From Swiss-Prot:
Signal peptide: 1-22
Organism of this sequence: Oldenlandia affinis
Residue pairs linked by disulfide bridges in the UniProt entry: C71-C85, C75-C87, C80-C93, C126-C140, C130-C142, C135-C148
Domain remarks in the Swiss-Prot or TrEMBL record: The presence of a 'disulfide through disulfide knot' structurally defines this protein as a knottin.
One GO BP annotation of this record: killing of cells of another organism
Role according to the record: Probably participates in a plant defense mechanism. Has hemolytic activity.
InterPro entries: Cyclotide, Cyclotide_moebius_CS, Cyclotide_sf
Record note on modification: Kalata-B3 and kalata-B6 are cyclic peptides.
Prodomain positions: 23-66, 97-121, 152-158
Residues joined by cross-link Cyclopeptide (Gly-Asp): G122-D151
Name of the protein this chain belongs to: Kalata-B3/B6
Family membership: Belongs to the cyclotide family. Moebius subfamily.
Keyword Signal applies: yes
Gene from which the chain derives: OAK2
Pfam assignment, any one: Cyclotide
Length: 158
């Protein structure tokens, strides 16, 4: 958010500069300045999106390694290539046993970091992951999996 604010202030300062000295600039120069401002703002926004994608990818990869029931592959010929996975709920490979507890704290930290970042960006997350296709938080659904999301817009109390 701080980067966006800085970009906005920079944009306003450049716009004020162009407005103040606009009479001395040609139309081509004005267009170049405006295009440069737009490109800078777009770059800042895309940096934030890339950060969110990286955090989500890291979270999902860690969850797969720490014991979420899916193995990250589909059944092929009735078998799964990932060790510890089986094709019992075709077409998705699932783990044979309960998740190991060794990495739970690390996974919770990653989940908390991901959810905090998403909430700061305004996504309606509920603060839990889907378990058995359901969410325990009232008003939340398991769509899109694996993050529970609110059915509608978040209420002011949430």
């Amino acid at each position: 958010m701080a980067k966006f604010t800085k970009s906005l202030v920079l944009c306003l300062l450049l716009a004020a500069f162009v407005g103040a000295f606009g009479a001395e600039l040609s139309e081509a120069d004005k267009a170049n300045v405006v295009n440069e401002i737009a490109a800078n703002i777009q770059r800042e926004i895309l940096k934030g999106v890339k950060s969110s994608e990286t955090t989500l990818t890291m979270f999902l990869k860690e969850m797969q390694l720490k014991g979420l029931p899916t193995c990250g592959e589909t059944c092929f010929g009735g078998t799964c290539n990932t060790p510890g996975c089986s094709c019992s709920s075709w077409p998705i490979c699932t783990r044979n046993g309960l998740p190991k507890r060794a990495g739970v704290k690390s996974s919770e930290t990653t989940l908390t970091m991901f959810l905090k970042e998403m909430q700061l960006k305004g996504l309606p997350t509920c603060g839990e992951t889907c378990f058995g296709g359901t969410c325990n938080t009232p008003g939340c659904t398991c769509d899109p999996w694996p993050i529970c999301t609110r059915d509608g817009l978040p209420s002011a109390a949430a």
